[in-house]
Amino acid sequence: MARLGALLLAAALGALLSFALLAAAVASDYWYILEVADAGNGSAWPGRAELLSSHSGLWRICEGQNGCIPLVDPFASESLDVSTSVQHLILLHRAVIVVLPLSLVLLVCGWICGLLSSLAQSVSLLLFTGCYFLLGSVLTLAGVSIYISYSHLAFAETVQQYGPQHMQGVRVSFGWSMALAWGSCALEAFSGTLLLSAAWTLSLSPPICGHLSPQQVGGRGGD
């Protein structure tokens, strides 16, 4: 039973850490980083690179020293007269800001289910909760993957609008917010695997009350 307790404790801690990482990722503004290279020592605007560089999250973008401004609300952009490619970007952004917060809610529900199944010592509930966490990790993975696709398409749309010559000194990368989301996804899958292992361990363990041997049954019958 010590092995079972260790598996359940590790799964609970993994789920809590997964929630914390994903919550920090969703709330932070370092998913996508855009850095502009310096124009050279002879530039008439020495601080140009810092002013044009930016980093953004799911909800807002921060540009240089100008502070952060909210991104365009994808749910309020249906009536805008934009191109098909921009409409596709809006749909992707809408999917991201729905899927990832939904993953947070599902993590809370999964943690509650895991607590109940641990207290009940039920194999079927542990199996259900383990599969639940694995499916939740797939949902988180889908949200992160959609964001990656959204970011690549948004940069390609920007290059198409302004021309490649204006984007030569621009370097884009994903920030630590993305790393937190990947870590949350991995921990969620890890917790689900631990719960499945706990269900398997519990199914192999003998009942707590034990079974009487035939000699014990005969002895009690004689009494």
Curated annotation (Swiss-Prot):
Signal peptide: 1-28
One term under GO cellular component: endoplasmic reticulum
Keyword rRNA-binding carried by entry: no
Highest taxon in the source lineage: Eukaryota
Sequence similarity: Belongs to the PMP-22/EMP/MP20 family.
PANTHER family: TRANSMEMBRANE PROTEIN 114/235 FAMILY MEMBER, TRANSMEMBRANE PROTEIN 235
Name of the protein described by the UniProt record: Transmembrane protein 235
Organism of origin: Homo sapiens (Human)
